[in-house]
From Swiss-Prot:
One of its GO terms (molecular function) is mRNA binding. SMART domains: RRM. This is CUGBP Elav-like family member 3. SUPFAM superfamilies: RNA-binding domain, RBD. It comes from the Eukaryota. Residues 7-88, 94-174, 367-445 form the RRM domain. It comes from Danio rerio. CDD domains: RRM1_CELF3_4_5_6 (cd12632), RRM2_CELF3_4_5_6 (cd12635), RRM3_CELF3_4_5_6 (cd12639). Its main location: nucleus. It is found in: Nucleus; Cytoplasm. Pfam families: RRM_1 (PF00076). One of its GO terms (cellular component) is nucleus.
Amino acid sequence: MKEADAIKLFIGQIPRNLEEKDLKPIFEQFGKIYELTVIKDKYTGMHKGCAFLTYCARESALKAQNALHEQKTLPGMNRPIQVKPADSEGRGDRKLFVGMLGKQLSDADVRKMFEPFGSIEECTVLRGPDGASKGCAFVKYQSNAEAQAAISALHGSRTLPGASSSLVVKFADTEKERGIRRMQQVASQLGVISPMSLHLGAYNAYTQALVQQQALVAQSAYLSPVATVAAVQMQQLAALNPSSIIATPIASITPSSGTSTPPTIAATPVPALPPPIAVNSYPPVPAAPNGQSASEALYTNGVHPYQAQSPALDPLQQAYTGMQHYTATYPAAYGLVGQPFPHQPTLVAQQPQQPQQLQQREGPEGCNIFIYHLPQEFTDSEMLQMFLPFGNVISAKVFVDRATNQSKCFGFVSFDNPASAQAAIQAMNGFQIGMKRLKVQLKRPKDANRPY
């Protein structure tokens, strides 16, 4: 029978020819085994070189970890065996974060609140440099069951004096989760949640003008199509006029039928746009799932451009005839409203993607970065989550040892533009996760054919 506070262990660096029956003799000496499962690929069934192990008793797991972790190397392996709590166990499953405490509460007050649910090993109110309470604390029980009982009974149950909301009681984050959250906070502070806002703030004003145009169309779908298109054309010309600072507001438009008057929509002042970025030196990047190219999505923040109607209805095309070759940079500036005239052809043809480019896993030159000193447990998905705040990620890959399927603690991330890559390097190089500091650098052209 398994104890309530039994620990699930992750076993790494085991030979791929060893199955459960071969591993049992190694671990049975520390106690009765409740469950031992070799981890295999769910699609291919191939051995991944690691396993999960749960003893009936918590004490047995601690003994096995102390005796084996990085102490013994199994035949055929280059590195010693790894024996440590699985990620699901490492969630601080006995350690709770308590928020929305009154700032006058002491450690003893918090301990008294949580003692009815079990034996407390640690209880600490977090305080600032001046000694003042931050209104939160960590409480660590002896078992997961006790921690669960405290969450069930206390979370959201009351609002303490001096707190702005009800009591928060939840499992504390792991080191990995804290690291990812800190990375995202750094990215947010640098202003790079929108990938180009760090360097190209004026483009966001351009996007805002497009959003307002779409709002106009959505609210005036019952208008005469010609009147709607004409109004939006005027708004686009005003927003894109380099010599103008304030876009002309769109006044009320009298509908062709009915008595209702649509709401007036005024444009926010839009600064003059900087010269377009020359994108012709970079090869086309893969198309995004919504049909936009990745470069188009970058400069429009995901706003879907409306299809153009006809040359006769597009004064922008006539006014800016010298800018056609920048359509990858300002694609939505050449489209009119598509709703009044559905299923019309696009005026400016987009460059077709080549099949081999759709399968491309690297970005253009200057858009690919290497990351060294990653935590051992980081996977592709966590790498992706770490670098998404800096821009559109084409691929994120942690390098894995083929023999052991264990991380080599480095990887690469490919963006679809150099600015995002530079922003990621600026923010993340030297960033500390646990005991490690990340090393983030640009992949040099001469590295193109090297795996690392």
